[in-house]
Curated annotation (Swiss-Prot):
Its main location: cytoplasm. An accessory protein needed during the final step in the assembly of 30S ribosomal subunit, possibly for assembly of the head region. Essential for efficient processing of 16S rRNA. May be needed both before and after RbfA during the maturation of 16S rRNA. It has affinity for free ribosomal 30S subunits but not for 70S ribosomes. InterPro entries: PRC-brl_dom, PRC_barrel-like_sf, RimM, RimM_N, RimM_N_sf, Transl_B-barrel_sf. The gene is rimM. Belongs to the RimM family. This is Ribosome maturation factor RimM. GO terms for biological process: ribosomal small subunit biogenesis; rRNA processing.
Length: 185
């Protein structure tokens, strides 16, 4: 398989989507966009994938919307289904420097929240944010704690509702303060 390679490695890679699988026999792939508006995935360029233990730049040749929610794309030099299948389940990555600057103090990129320590207003550490779930109502922080003895870790879901539950976000110290209690059963 020949993927266009530029001697470049993303310094601060951010996942903006995922290659879901092959589409048809001519090298097209289905992609899942993680951007807020699904079409915004095409604003960012170049795309990188971590393929066969190396970062590679992949270039779009064509793209189109399928059934109003998913895109199919054709990459340069990916010409058949076998090549497309080899790319399946790879994350689509861009440099974080491409993201626009946030001017509202209550706006955050997920990349900045993931990894933050979660502290209660009483000073108890609940764990670290390992991922975020996007729902129509609000985002949900997935917080992993290793405090509990009978299992290796416990995940806790905390709604990201500013002022009501999320009391403070300090990206310098990597700490999110929450008004939330964990109850052991």
């Amino acid at each position: 398989m020949k993927v266009i390679v530029i001697n470049s490695t993303p310094i601060n890679p951010i996942v903006i989507g995922r290659i879901k699988g092959a589409y048809g026999i001519l090298g097209w792939v289905k992609i899942l966009s993680f951007t807020e508006k699904i079409e915004d995935i095409f604003v960012y360029n170049p795309w990188f994938i971590f393929f066969r233990s190396k970062w590679k730049v992949i270039k779009l040749e064509y793209w189109r919307l399928m059934n109003n929610k998913n895109y199919i794309v054709k990459f340069f030099n990916v010409s058949d289904r076998n090549h497309a299948m080899a790319l399946s389940q790879h994350n689509l990555v861009v440099e974080s420097i491409q993201f626009p600057k946030l001017y509202n103090k209550d706006e955050y990129y997920w990349k900045d929240i993931i990894g933050c320590k979660i502290m209660t207003i009483n000073g108890k550490c609940l764990g670290r944010v390992i991922s975020i779930i996007d729902t129509k109502a609000h985002d949900i922080l997935v917080v992993r704690s290793e405090e509990y003895g009978f299992t290796k870790y416990v995940d806790c879901l905390i709604p990201f509702i500013l002022k009501k539950i999320i009391k403070d976000v300090d990206l310098i110290k990597n700490i999110v303060v929450v008004d939330w209690e964990i109850y052991k059963f």
